[in-house]
Amino acid sequence: MLDHVIGDKPRVVILNKKDMASQSETDKWLNHLKRQGVYPAAVNGKEPNILKKIEAPVVEATREIFQRMEKKGINPRAIRAMIVGIPNVGKSTIINNIAKRKVAKTGNTPGVTKAQQWIKAGTKMELLDTPGVLWPKFEDPEIGLKLSLTGAIKDNVVNLDEVAIFALKFMQEHHLAELNKFYNINIDSTTEIVDIFDAIGNSRGFKMSGNEIDYERVTEKVIYDTRDAKIGQLTFDLAEEI
């Protein structure tokens, strides 16, 4: 659908929340996107120089268009761009930072932006803010688990146990040292998932009557620690798996 709407127009991809993602994976993604003919940039939506970082690839992406306009004697105008992304990736935070005032609602839950609006961004750009969009159906269930871990899907529409299990298995395979250090546990690559839950529950003191592990608290803890990047800088979509 988006490919049909965008057509042959220049496309800029902004990888937000780079401070919460694996730096090495971000670099791989930037290189991959460049090879695809896309103009990418990795940013932290709250950083002070955000406008320059976003403006640079946008100007580069539209350079040929404005050169043709100049040859025809057409006065240059502001670049108009539509901002499109999944919910809760920080689009509104970026827009407010660029505009230097609160023009878009923000929140750590999906679906905060409800309407479209044009935002002036410096002297070179005008940005159309749009509500977050998602696929109507996920062909691969793993996509939904990954999106849930970023907060793009509301918690009441997913199985949080499955989300936490996916997160722990991913970290067990790719970030074992960080997982052990953060929760002060001692697991290895062969540890069964239920034993990982038990280890975290014992370490954090999440117990119910009868000294039973409170798995619901462990589940919530793992999910929110992952979303807040407390365990480490994680990237769930690995460039090597493209």
Where do the language-model regions lie?
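Alpha-helical scaffold segments in soluble metabolic enzymes
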Residues: 53, 57, 93, 97, ...
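Helix-rich effector regions associated with P-loop NTPase G domains
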Residues: 1-12, 18, 39, 45, ...
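A structural signal for isolated positions on well-ordered beta-strands in alpha/beta enzyme cores
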Residues: 12-13, 82
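Canonical P-loop GTPase G-domain recognition
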Residues: 19-85, 204-207, 213, 217
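Conserved protein kinase catalytic core
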Residues: 22-23, 50, 102, 135-138
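Glycine-rich phosphate-binding P-loop
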Residues: 80-100, 130
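Conserved P-loop NTPase mechanochemical-coupling segment
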Residues: 95-106, 201
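Short coil/loop residues immediately preceding or within conserved phosphate-binding loops
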Residues: 76-78, 101, 116
